[in-house]
Amino acid sequence: MGQIEWAMWANEQALASGLILITGGIVATAGQFAQWYLGAYSIAAGVLICLLEYPRGKRSKGSTMERCGQKYLTRAVKVFGPLTSNYYIRAFLHLGLSVPAGFLLATILGTACLAIASSIYLLAAIHGEHWTPIETKPKERPQVGGTIKQPPSNPPPRPPAEARKKPSEEEVAGVPGGGPQENPMPVTDEVV
């Protein structure tokens, strides 16, 4: 059985956590909770987490499906270098971002999810994983001369493939092949 790539699970968990934090922050801010400023913090932290987690990392084996529009955010995440590619840093960043949001009921679910994502990132870092961007390779065009094996010898229009078959030895010798045969008994059409 193959080895589990923990970073993929952590990425999905952290992205969902960011969206949950944004939602809880909107509820807390719009509902004018007593500590509504923690709701505003949760919105900002959720947006930061979503921007950081939207680009998927490349898998070590197999292929990775790129998210829609990921290539633009990948460039931004690559700029920060080891701050974003090291999963130890991501684990502690997520854990630190989740603490203030834990003091508000509307954002406590996002906090719990982000703490779980942080622990999964820590597990991924312990297993030696790191974030590498998915870079699209240019598509190779087939060589025009390399795809044609043998050019056709007959000019168009060509007869169908069955009609172009070379006659077999039996047909050359006069032995009837699979064509029409003569019925040895005469058949008459009698209508009664």
Curated annotation (Swiss-Prot):
Tagged with keyword Cytoplasm: no
Example of a GO biological process term: inflammatory response
Intramembrane stretch boundaries: 70-80
UniProt keywords, alphabetically: Cell membrane, Electron transport, Heme, Iron, Isopeptide bond, Membrane, Metal-binding, NADP, Oxidoreductase, Phosphoprotein, Transmembrane, Transmembrane helix, Transport, Ubl conjugation
Post-translational modification: Phosphorylation at Thr-147 enhances NADPH oxidase activity by promoting NCF1/p47-phox binding. Ubiquitinated at Lys-149 likely by RNF145.
Major localization listed first in the record, in broad terms: membrane
GO cellular component, one term: NADPH oxidase complex
Paired cysteines (S-S): none
Pfam families documented for this protein: Cytochrom_B558a
Main function: Subunit of NADPH oxidase complexes that is required for the NADPH oxidase activity that generates, in various cell types, superoxide from molecular oxygen utilizing NADPH as an electron donor. Subunit of the phagocyte NADPH oxidase complex that mediates the transfer of electrons from cytosolic NADPH to O2 to produce the superoxide anion (O2(-)). In the activated complex, electrons are first transferred from NADPH to flavin adenine dinucleotide (FAD) and subsequently transferred via two heme molecules to molecular oxygen, producing superoxide through an outer-sphere reaction.
Self-association and partners: Component of the phagocyte NADPH oxidase core complex/cytochrome b558 complex, composed of CYBB (heavy chain (beta)) and CYBA (light chain (alpha)). Component of the phagocyte NADPH oxidase complex composed of an obligatory core heterodimer formed by the membrane proteins CYBA and CYBB and the cytosolic regulatory subunits NCF1/p47-phox, NCF2/p67-phox, NCF4/p40-phox and the small GTPase RAC1 or RAC2. Interacts with NCF1 (via SH3 domain). Interacts with SH3PXD2A. Interacts with DUOX1, DUOX2 and TPO. Interacts with NOX4; this interaction mediates superoxide generation.
Entry's family note: Belongs to the p22phox family.
Record-given protein name: Cytochrome b-245 light chain
Species whose genome carries this gene: Tursiops truncatus (Atlantic bottle-nosed dolphin)
Gene: CYBA
